Amino acid sequence: MTALIGSADERLRADLRPLPAHTRIHTCAAFSHTSEPDEPIGATRHALGVLARRWLQLNIEITALDDQLAQVVPVAAPTLLDVYGVGIDTAGALLVTAGDNPDRMRSEAAFAALCGVSPVPASSGKITRHRLNRGGNREANSALWRVAMVRLSKHQPTRDYAAKRTAQGRTKPEIIRILKRYIAREVYPHLRQTTDT
């Protein structure tokens, strides 16, 4: 919608651009279905109206799904939400990754590999390093990354750990890789408890 408004007629652009996003959506949604699509401004208003009404409908569906997720996750994994930085969306992504098959998660190392946070050796000469794992479930990897970002910004023990690792010469991507592995280790028992029941 922003691109369409940016290329719209100057009068329409002047009316819509200063509005806050939510007000702009409702304003565009109110555009009539009967706009004259043969005129450029009418066609733009028609397209903006269609897009805005679709956005509002999708927003209603997202809200309903978020409400369902907020009810299901605490029942499926009551202790998972106690892990610092794990919210409803993150817990949902981790639960989907864990699935209902506990046999595929034999250990926390197997869970880490499933999430793509197991270290991959990338040593050269006298330097011992590990690189990011590009495999595994990308949604779970992203969920662990979000937890790591929350912890790096608000969790003092994690911030202290990152400062210590930085002083040792580690780069930020290496620190995040290590944190994701630790978080996977911390989350695993909560998921295992869920899948064992």
Regions found by a protein language model. Name each.
Residues 1-197:
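A detector of single, family-specific signature residues
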